[in-house]
Amino acid sequence: MSKTADRIAVVSTHFREDLRHWIAADRKAALRILDLMAAILADSFAGIGKPESLKFALSGCWSRRITQEHRLVYRVTADRIEFIQARFHYE
């Protein structure tokens, strides 16, 4: 299990805009995002949403499935978990 208790959650402006979109357009997806965030804070690299380490331009980031089409993208460092985006595939 990943040690995340010492890490703070940081939400990017892009992520916040994406979450606002989901709240207005699809509350079920918005709730899924909140569930994924809780799971990531509990264990950054395992759990629901099929965690996947990303490569190339997003090397160092991870993703989890919101829906078949959309992904939650986040980065984990020693002291923080940064939530980067919550719509589309990787931008």
Residue ranges and their predicted role:
Residues 1-8, 14-31, 35, 48, ...:
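Enriched for short, Lys/Arg-rich terminal
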Residues 42-45:
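Generic structural signal for secondary-structure transition and capping sites
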